[in-house]
Amino acid sequence: MWALRSLLRPLGLRTMSQGSARRPRPPKDPLRHLRTREKRGPGWGPGGPNTVYLQVVAAGGRDAAAALYVFSEYNRYLFNCGEGVQRLMQEHKLKVARLDNIFLTRMHWSNVGGLCGMILTLKETGLPKCVLSGPPQLEKYLEAIKIFSGPLKGIDLAVRPHSAPEYKDETMTVYQVPIHSERRCGEQEPSRSPKRSPNRLSPKQSSSDPGSAENGQCLPEGSSAGVNGKAWGRDPSLVVAFVCKLHLRKGNFLVLKAKELGLPVGTAAIAPIIAAVKDGKSITYEGREIAAEELCTPPDPGLVFIVVECPDEGFIQPICENDTFQRYQGEADAPVAVVVHIAPESVLIDSRYQQWMERFGPDTQHLILNENCPSVHNLRSHKIQTQLSLIHPDIFPQLTSFHSKEEGSTFSLPTVRGECLLKYHVRPKREWQRDTTLDCNTDEFIAEALELPNFQESVEEYRKNMQASPAPAEKRSQYPEIVFLGTGSAIPMKIRNVSSTLVNLSPDKSVLLDCGEGTFGQLCRHYGQQIDRVLCNLTAVFVSHLHADHHTGLLNILLQREHALASLGKPFQPLLVVAPTQLRAWLQQYHNQCQEILHHISMIPAKCLQKGAEVPSPPVERLISLLLETCDLQEFQTCLVRHCKHAFGCALVHSSGWKVVYSGDTMPCEALVQMGKDATLLIHEATLEDGLEEEAVEKTHSTTSQAIGVGMRMNAEFIMLNHFSQRYAKIPLFSPDFNEKVGIAFDHMKVCFGDFPTVPKLIPPLKALFADDIEEMVERREKRELRLVRAALLTQQADSSEDREPHQKRAHSEEPHSPQSKKVRAQ
């Protein structure tokens, strides 16, 4: 393997670019389902789908806000897109590339938190257009995400406002039903509108904060986007329900019956007969009148399903009195097959809501999605963690989950609580299907690992080595404790979530280093019922840069932290956020148009913590002092790193003397080396394997050996590698530079300084656990390097032939022409 790479150098093929520009990607071929649709043409009428089912993507638990996937052979739809939905769809093979319609029931982070990542993924798949339906703020939300995503070229994002007429496609007609709460803007629950701290980042104060004026994102003096949020487009009093009516499915033509009656089956004359009877018309054949019922099965009626969200009691009466819903209750023309209720238990136990549910009749099914739906969602993550815990149960603790303590409501109706992947078939037969739901069987996971060749032996060998190792001269403190929540890059995947690392400074103080989408869900699965305590302990968040995989989990952390403080009876204080000033523009836009969040944050511009930087104002100086005091730090330093514009790394120096350095995303960076000199721990990105140095430069990331090299130059006591490309889903490839000072991070891995001698010794059992994956990656690398060798040889041959050709021409022209050569030329 390493010999192959050595062949490349004498052949003159670069293994490392000196700074080449990123190569443009070739245009993608149209997706298959779009090519099929284009062939059918605009006039094609399918007559309604044969198969339609609703499937729960996320059951509405605290770690997985409610999301519903609807399938037909013609279309795919998604209702709501909270954080983690993209990851779940990828894990459970629900095709994202087929989604051309996303319906959103309200403008709240639990409904739209995963939308940014989903849009970026849809763009990458080559989907040309996606239509978003729901609240009017959707258009402003899309404008807001462009602050950090860029212009989103290549995908047409259309917004269908809730006031638009019905939408119709090959599968169904969708009617949007706007519902306004009795509680207007500003009439929130006391726990959801805490008293504001003087240190918060408010709309008015933002004009005096550094960076806000230069970004042009502060609100005008004297304006208010708090109580009167509607003035700026924010409207929490609006939800949008969706009534979806399937197209009538024509009956099936009975071929055998037609033959019995002597009809011309198998000839061109049968086509108009089939068309007529499918339309319910009688036909006359050879003087006989034949009723449509004799030749065709009954048509499948245009059943209806309804998706409705009722966030609190203020929406109950408007829902009960809504005219559109009343048309589908009692003796309705179109029977309602199922109603999906996204509602908390406080709504479901209300007698008014239960009576409204009963009015749909006994044949209508009801699906509940809320926090009382305990369901495992990320099965692969549970499986991997269970198997890793066999190696070291403290470093790889088993996952848990958060369960609501509220008692579930009881119903006299046919009611089902959601589970991940639960299906309800509307067509061809109305029925629940549970064979796809998840079973988190830890015994099965353990048995599977124990059957792997050499795994048990390598674990036993590791334990013997640890017992034989000399005891450390001094026992190191449990703190700081590093919990890796997301160790993958770019997009959330089934094994590795995107960037986030929790540093527990003490039993009651912690800092979050980056906060990618799904960070709160990872915390829930790691800490379970202790999640509120963990959120209350969170004192600061560092956001390294504005790529979506590093900060789109922040808003959920802010909202859930507010909930945690209220539930534990603790006073509200804004969270200290160290970030590039450009983050403020996104927060301001979301606050103005979607949901009030600025009171959650006291922001410190990352540039103000660079060595030698001038602190621009007394308020920021006070916040920096508060950060150091609260976290018991001597220093919180940042430096610019080599990634995108305004990308930072950071170093935390504790009063007890230890130093933790975090690289964020970067190529090897001298400024980081200098800032991190003599670090106790360096957490450095290692996105790509060795041999992909040129790609690393194009993408402004580091390879494994480059990251280790930075740590060695820094004289770091220990190096933890993370932020691996998702091509290394379970484990990265090891380089020859790995040594006793290097470890690799996994999601939910927990280490403290006392674990430094242990972590490198985990590599042999890890290699045994993931032997098949490593073998596959090695094969891929060898094939890639062989291709490079062949390409280099061809280039070399082409160059040498070009060099020989002019010489041959000169020699040929100098020779006298013989009669034989003339004969050859003539031939």
From Swiss-Prot:
Q: What class of enzyme is it?
A: hydrolase
**Subcellular locations according to the entry:** Mitochondrion; Mitochondrion matrix, Mitochondrion nucleoid; Nucleus
| UniProt entry tagged with the keyword Transit peptide | yes
Could you tell me the EC number(s) of this protein? 3.1.26.11
Where are residues bearing Phosphoserine located in the sequence?
A: 193, 197, 202, 207, 617, 735, 800, 818
Which residues constitute the organelle targeting sequence? Answer: 1-16
User: Where does it primarily localize?
Assistant: mitochondrion
Q: What GO MF terms are annotated?
A: 3'-tRNA processing endoribonuclease activity; metal ion binding; tRNA-specific ribonuclease activity
Quote a single Gene Ontology cellular component term: nucleus
GO biological process terms held by the UniProt record: mitochondrial tRNA 3'-end processing
What role is this protein assigned? Zinc phosphodiesterase, which displays mitochondrial tRNA 3'-processing endonuclease activity. Involved in tRNA maturation, by removing a 3'-trailer from precursor tRNA. Associates with mitochondrial DNA complexes at the nucleoids to initiate RNA processing and ribosome assembly.
**Protein name according to UniProt:** Zinc phosphodiesterase ELAC protein 2
